[in-house]
Amino acid sequence: MQKKAVILYSGGLDSTTCLAIAKEQGFAPYALSFSYGQRHQQELEVAKLNARPMGAVDHLLVEFDLRKMGGSALTSDIEVPKEGVGEEIPVTYVPARNTIFLSFALGWAETLDCFDIFIGVNALDYSGYPDCRPEFISAYETMANLATKAGVEGKRLKIHTPLISLTKAEIIQKGLSLGVDYSKTHSCYDPAEDGAACGRCDSCRLRLKGFAEAGVTDPVKYQKL
């Protein structure tokens, strides 16, 4: 019987590649997306349209509103920076977001009798978010195996991070080798009303840099700069 895996799936470049990798590795992917009050709602529309065509057995959308807390340019009226990736943790960091996301994934995994979770975090070409680092993932996996019925019963849960040591160009090349259609992904933090990417936020800059280094044209629509 095919093993199940919960895939954190935003509709972005990394999570879409992650879903394709899970499928390549023989897992039956269960896609998990979140509507958390993010300003870039277009990613959810992409996720809804593409989860099942990408091979997801099921696609669950969980809704909660982090705008009530604020603290991030993605969940409040703070302006999204357009001046490139700096050294400090940027204002686009959403406090504890991956901890929250992984906790929902952990709960769904237990419900599904599933012991594998995939998350598309990356520690090379990234914005410096603390919850994308290997040490965070390792600590969370340890906690998950202490905090769940499955873990206590000896059914070890594993958090897979297949992109964590890849450059953005390598991620794109891997996805293309698996047939990922990157025109059906969304990365921009501050898109136009028609969905066109801004081309200037951290996420757009990292994406464009990755495509350039991979020698491939990014197929998504960008605003005229």
Curated annotation (Swiss-Prot):
Protein name per its UniProtKB record: 7-cyano-7-deazaguanine synthase
Gene Ontology molecular functions: ATP binding; ligase activity, forming carbon-nitrogen bonds; zinc ion binding
Q: Which family does it belong to?
A: Belongs to the QueC family.
Which superkingdom, per the lineage? Bacteria
EC identifiers of the protein = 6.3.4.20
EC category name: ligase
Write down how the cofactor binds this protein.
Answer: Binds 1 zinc ion per subunit.
Q: Per the entry, which co-factors are needed?
A: Zn(2+)
Q: Which pathway does the UniProt entry assign to this protein? A: Purine metabolism; 7-cyano-7-deazaguanine biosynthesis
Looking up SUPFAM superfamilies in the UniProt record yields:
Adenine nucleotide alpha hydrolases-like (SSF52402)
Q: Which residues form a coiled coil?
A: none
Pfam families with a match to the protein in the record = QueC (PF06508)
Residues annotated to bind ATP: 9-19
Amino-acid positions noted as binding Zn(2+) in the UniProt annotation, renumbered to this chain: 188, 198, 201, 204
**Listed HAMAP family:** QueC
InterPro entries xrefs: QueC, Rossmann-like_a/b/a_fold
Keyword Nucleotide-binding part of the UniProt annotation: yes
Q: Which reaction does it catalyse?
A: 7-carboxy-7-deazaguanine + NH4(+) + ATP = 7-cyano-7-deazaguanine + ADP + phosphate + H2O + H(+)
Q: What does this protein do?
A: Catalyzes the ATP-dependent conversion of 7-carboxy-7-deazaguanine (CDG) to 7-cyano-7-deazaguanine (preQ(0)).
Keywords annotated in UniProt: ATP-binding, Ligase, Metal-binding, Nucleotide-binding, Queuosine biosynthesis, Zinc
Q: Does the keyword Zinc apply?
A: yes
